[in-house]
């Protein structure tokens, strides 16, 4: 009961700091776990000559994805919703990569098609998580360094655990679905984070131009 009362007595700023630190920490822990796509592709015999093509397609998709999701975020006036959407779809689709058929004549083509589609949702995850964190820290005067350090710390911890425990015990394919599971708390915490005010749509005033023209200091 005492712990519950303490949590309820937290100021909105402190509560938001804890939420953002949780999002950053869990997000980067999940990213550390799911950082073995290239290792997996090599283990199944993905042609080395096609890695260059896959990377080229991934770069093109990254440029388009960032532009697309940035536009959508501006249109709907929400950064938080885009974070939730990209985390959910990016990780939800990523866990199915090990299920793509291997050893078939069409396997390479499937990877070249499906991985860029998955990356369309995965690439914006990190920029939008940082966007949400930076804006909320600025608007509510939170300590960004402390919030962001949780991500760096848990990234290192999760990386050590993955290399020394998860992969030896369950293999590289397990990193895909474990990443999805680890990311779930980050998605839930994001739902309860504040929506940055600067991310909301601002209704344009029809008299805006007239006001500027009458402002002699501006003219």
Segments from the language model and where they lie:
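Cytoplasmic membrane-interface "Motif A"-like loop-to-helix N-cap segments
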Residues: 74-88
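Hydrophobic core of transmembrane alpha-helices in multi-pass small-molecule transporters
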Residues: 25, 93, 105-127
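Symmetry-related core transmembrane helices of the 12-TM Major Facilitator Superfamily/SLC fold
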Residues: 158, 174-192
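Helix-to-loop junctions at the C-terminal end of transmembrane segments
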Residues: 64-78, 166-167
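C-terminal ends and interior cores of transmembrane alpha-helices
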Residues: 88-105
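Juxtamembrane intracellular "pre-TM" segments in multi-pass secondary transporters
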Residues: 1-14, 193-219
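Helix-loop boundary and gating motifs at the non-cytosolic
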Residues: 6-60, 217-219
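Cytoplasmic helix-loop-helix junction between adjacent transmembrane helices
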Residues: 115-150
């Amino acid at each position: 009961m005492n712990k519950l009362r303490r949590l309820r007595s937290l100021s909105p700023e402190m509560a938001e700091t804890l939420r953002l630190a949780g999002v950053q920490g869990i997000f980067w822990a999940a990213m550390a776990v799911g950082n073995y796509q290239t290792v997996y592709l090599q283990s199944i015999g993905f042609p080395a000559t096609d890695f260059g093509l896959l990377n080229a397609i991934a770069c093109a998709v990254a440029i388009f994805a960032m532009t697309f999701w940035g536009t959508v975020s501006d249109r709907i006036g929400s950064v938080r919703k885009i974070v939730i959407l990209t985390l959910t779809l990016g990780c939800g689709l990523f866990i199915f990569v090990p299920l793509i058929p291997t050893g078939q004549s069409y396997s390479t083509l499937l990877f070249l098609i499906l991985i860029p589609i998955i990356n369309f949702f995965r690439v914006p995850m990190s920029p939008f998580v940082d966007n949400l964190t930076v804006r909320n820290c600025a608007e509510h005067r939170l300590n960004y360094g402390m919030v962001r350090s949780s991500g760096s710390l848990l990234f290192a911890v999760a990386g050590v655990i993955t290399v020394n425990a998860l992969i030896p015990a369950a293999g590289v394919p397990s990193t895909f679905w474990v990443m999805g599971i680890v990311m779930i708390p980050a998605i839930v915490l994001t739902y309860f984070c504040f929506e940055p005010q600067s991310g909301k749509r601002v209704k344009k005033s029809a008299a805006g131009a007239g006001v500027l023209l009458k402002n002699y200091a501006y003219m």
